[in-house]
Regions:
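S-adenosyl-L-methionine-dependent DNA methyltransferase catalytic core
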Residues: 1-30, 37-100, 205-208, 232-307
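Short secondary-structure junctions
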Residues: 34-36, 213-214
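Core alpha/beta nucleotide-donor-binding catalytic domains of modification enzymes
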Residues: 55-178, 188-192, 197-200, 207
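Acidic pyrophosphate-coordinating catalytic loop
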Residues: 131, 224-228
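A cross-domain feature marking catalytic cores of carbohydrate-active enzymes
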Residues: 145, 186, 217, 252
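A short, glycine/Asx- and small/polar-enriched loop/turn
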Residues: 137, 227-232
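Conserved beta-strand signature within the Rossmann-like core of class I S-adenosyl-L-methionine
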Residues: 180-184
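Conserved S-adenosyl-L-methionine
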Residues: 123-124, 188, 211-223
């Protein structure tokens, strides 16, 4: 029965396949893909779109088989640019023991210490951290070096931007620690920044460190049980002495798209509804900018002088 099919709104479908909301709307109106309406919202049934690679992957997912790996032993890790701990939490849930987390921002460090008092949080500038005591003691190093220098939503200064040079601090940490594997994430704009020369520099640096880079991949959060339209470039590198002995496989996507309702109310993500909260008030300047974004829009809808 058609009512048992998975419904996805036009906007979420656009995020899933990496196109604009306007394009998804045109597909629905032109009949490029069969559209339907549920509760006043127009969208599509995933089962009718299985020819699309992203949809096929979701409908034939091995998510449940891959979600509960059993570690062969206790694995150690180091987290750089830890922020509030999102990536670190994921690594912890995957079975890694954090030996060290480094973060510059005091508020973020306070958050880490409050939520995970057992973690060894080193607050301060990564440029002042000596990683040599951890040499050959760490299995995995990870970090999302600051992305403003490469972001589509930023001025794209790249390595000319002070923040862009922090990649080389991550590279120094890898050189001093010599982890078996390291991972870094950034915005997908990094791939095309400066006509690809920035990313070529990163790839060459990884090779000089003695690591083999797995073919980088842009992962969409919306495909991995996260109710968020966020895309991130994931880079994983394996130390050369191990690279021929292991095979890395990107994870299968979740079987359906999660929405804001899943984030706010009891669902497959959370056991309870989100508690009642006053929320956070934006500064007046930021609130004014956000008011210029139409429903379903993003930074690309802002006037050029603001975006």
């Amino acid at each position: 029965m058609i009512c048992n099919m998975q419904f996805i709104s036009e906007n979420n479908f656009a995020a899933l396949v990496g196109t604009s909301n306007a394009t998804a709307q045109k597909w629905a109106e032109s009949g490029t893909y069969p559209s339907h309406t549920e509760n006043g919202v127009r969208g599509f049934y995933l089962e009718e779109l299985e020819a699309i690679p992203e949809v096929h992957a979701m409908l034939n997912s091995k998510w449940n088989e891959e979600c509960n790996p059993v570690p062969l032993r206790a694995f150690t890790s180091v987290e750089l640019f830890a922020g509030g701990g999102g990536l670190a939490l994921g690594m912890s849930l995957a079975g890694f023991h954090h030996v060290l987390l480094n973060e510059f921002d005091k508020a973020a460090c306070d958050t880490l210490r409050l939520n995970r008092p057992q973690w060894n949080v080193l607050e301060g500038d990564i440029r002042n951290v000596d990683f040599t005591p951890l040499c050959n003691r760490i299995d995995f190093l990870s970090g999302g070096f600051p992305c403003q220098a490469f972001s589509y939503a930023g001025k794209q200064g790249g390595f000319n931007d002070t923040r862009g040079t922090l990649f080389f601090e991550l590279a120094r940490a890898v050189s001093e620690i010599k982890p078996k594997v390291f991972m870094c994430e950034n915005v997908k704009g990094l791939l095309s920044h400066d006509n690809g020369r920035t990313f070529d520099t990163i790839k060459n640096t990884i090779a000089e460190l003695g690591y083999t880079l797995v073919e980088p991949c842009v992962l969409k959060a919306i495909m991995y049980q996260v109710p968020q339209k966020r895309e991130r470039l994931i880079m994983i590198a394996i130390r050369n002495d191990l690279a021929t002995k292991v095979r890395f496989v990107w994870p299968s996507p979740f079987s359906r798209v999660m929405t804001l309702r899943d984030a706010f109310y009891k669902s497959e993500i959370f056991d309870t509804d989100v508690p009642v909260s006053e929320g956070v008030k934006y500064p007046s300047k930021k609130e004014k900018v956000l008011s210029l974004v139409p429903q379903g829009g993003d930074w690309r809808n802002l006037p050029e002088e603001i975006a």
